[in-house]
Structures are given as C-alpha cells and as structure tokens.
C-alpha cells in the first residue's frame, strides 16, 4: 500500500521557472500513461549526486559515430536535381446545384 506525505518546497528564489507543482509546493511529474510521480527534496538531491547521473548513456558513442557517418555520406554524394511533383487541378463546380442536389 502506498503512502502520501506532503513535503513543502520553497520556490521563491526560482520564480521565473515554471515547475509542475501542487498548491502546497510539492514537485511532481506525470508519465505518458497519466501516473503522477511526486518527488521530495531529498530524493531529488540524491538523484543529482548519484553516480548514474554523472555517467553518459552507453549508446552515446554509437549515436555519435552514426551521425558522423551520415555527415560523411552526405558530403561525398553528388547532388541530384529533383523535379517538383505535378498535381492535377480538380475542376471547380460551376454553381451550388452541382454540389448539393435537391430532390
């Protein structure tokens, strides 16, 4: 069973930044599914100082190499001329009788 407790947070010094806060000043976030996650001050400070927050993502080197390869491929290819797509104009009805037939 989950428990709820209020932890007041003073945001007077950072009033220019719009955090998701409740009326009592508690910081929270929501997931795409609509679950509300409430963060207390101690947990946020622990997350900021955790070793995981100070390490880069493991796939960062792969992403960087992939982006570099794309840039190299773009610079070595010859530019091709493209023609704009042609569209056929639809004939406009001559009057409203064609659009709304009355019986």
From Swiss-Prot:
- GO terms (BP aspect): negative regulation of translational initiation
Listed A to Z, the keywords are: Protein synthesis inhibitor, Translation regulation
InterPro entries according to UniProt = EIF4EBP
Q: Which Gene Ontology terms cover its molecular function?
A: eukaryotic initiation factor 4E binding
- Where along the chain is composition biased (Low complexity)? 76-92
Which residues belong to the signal peptide in this entry? none
Chain spans, region Disordered: 49-103
One annotated Gene Ontology cellular component of this protein: cytoplasm
Task: Identify one Pfam family in the record.
Answer: eIF_4EBP
The family assignment reads: Belongs to the eIF4E-binding protein family.
Q: What does this protein do?
A: Regulates assembly of the eIF4F complex.
Give the protein's recorded name: Eukaryotic translation initiation factor 4E-1A-binding protein homolog
């Amino acid at each position: 069973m989950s428990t709820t407790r209020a932890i007041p947070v003073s945001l007077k010094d950072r009033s220019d930044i719009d955090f998701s806060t409740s009326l009592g000043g508690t910081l929270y976030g929501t997931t795409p599914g609509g679950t509300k996650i409430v963060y207390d001050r101690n947990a946020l400070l622990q997350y900021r100082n955790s070793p995981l927050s100070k390490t880069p993502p493991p796939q960062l080197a792969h992403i960087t190499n992939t982006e570099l390869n794309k840039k190299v491929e773009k610079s070595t290819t010859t530019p091709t001329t493209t023609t704009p797509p042609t569209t056929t104009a639809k004939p406009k009805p001559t009057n409203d009788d064609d659009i709304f037939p009355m019986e």
